[in-house]
Amino acid sequence: MKTKNICCIGAGFVGGPTMAVIALKCPEITINVVDINQDKIDAWNGDLSNLPVFEPGLADIISKVRNQNLFFSTNIDQSIDVAEMIFMAVNTPTKTSGKGRGYAADLTFVENCAKNIARVSKSDKIIIEKSTLPVRTAEKIKEILDSNNDLNINFDVLSNPEFLAEGTAINDLFKSDRVLIGGDNTKSGNIAVSNLVEIYSRWIPKDKILTTNVWSSELSKLVSNAMLAQRISSINSISALCEKTGAKVDEVSIAVGMDKRIGPSFLNSSIGFGGSCFKKDILNLVYISKHYGLDEVAEYWENVVRINDYQTNRFGEKIIEALNSDLNSKTISILGWAFKKDTNDSRESASISLAKKLLLNGAKLKIYDPMVSVYQIVYDIKNKISEDGLGEQEIDNLISNVTVCENFHSAIKNSNLVSLCTDWDEFKEINWKEAKSIMSLNPTLFDGRNLVDKHQLESLGYQVYIIGKP
């Protein structure tokens, strides 16, 4: 049976771009992206320059398919009812309470999604896990679907994890390294897999579409993110050693990456990885490992997160040390709030932890990011500070020391220290000679992304610290 209608539940960083590309490549399929958040849906239907997800190339695709065969709405039940295939792209945050708190994935949204699908469905459905989920979640989803529907409907649950890097998501969708589809080895399961393969094969070569059982697919997504994060933590641990020994981490990265067995990807030292996936998925892997009694395995992967936290904290301590441990009369500029360039996503960004540390030590902050909104930056800081149990008035007092700026120049004006935290291209083009004229006397530059030439800036009169360099 050919798929004529797709419903995607969840209009976020995964659902929006993925469905846009499928709509572009499969114009005969009607796709409804639904979400309970009316503001988010309004944004998807609004100005192309202000979509809720910023990805290079996304707005152009949306302009071609929106209201043609791609629709955004809050009509969840209606969209489920008419769809033959339903993608689940809802959030799976780390649990904040109960068993597994701080490690396990919170499957509340997934479970509610499954219950709603079961309640509404009047015909057979193919259900596709697009969210990153723990191993054997498909089994739980299947149980919920079957136990909450009285019409003897067949639900086939597939795992089809996304492997998108924010900032390059559209290119990743067009030119995927692989598309992974996990399904049950049953007659209906194989038909369901074939239906999804048919959709992707419209633009992805068949040899890059990998089919496995459901459990291998679910685990592969967690392991992929864990191993990418592991590489970042590995080179970040070496950056600390470089600073002590006189080696340069960028030179070490190049030398190591030229070994074809290792390769150069994810060997750029920074103040720490961020984003919605890496930390969450590693902690999920830790929890699963502990659940099965694999304590040594759990400890191994948890150390990846510990090194990441160490790197961010180390950067903050270096800043405090550079200002003689007295931040009360100091203004510090944070350039970059998104966890990486070419995205407006600030989830788990190292800038958030850095800002909290500096504020609690008395600094005044001026923050600039070309894509992250003022609202989001203030929200992130408040949310992070509240983890320490501070009262509302204490939090407001700290927030009063934060200024979110509209451009780079206003962010560094009269600043004592500038911290480069995100690798935005515009930060690579800064004229530091001109910048020095509007900063305070004897300015200091902390480069957490290896973007500047240390000797050049020192010749201009800056004190310079670059992560991973003596």
What are these regions (language model features)?
Residues M1-P470:
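Structural/interface elements that position substrates and couple domains in central-metabolism enzymes
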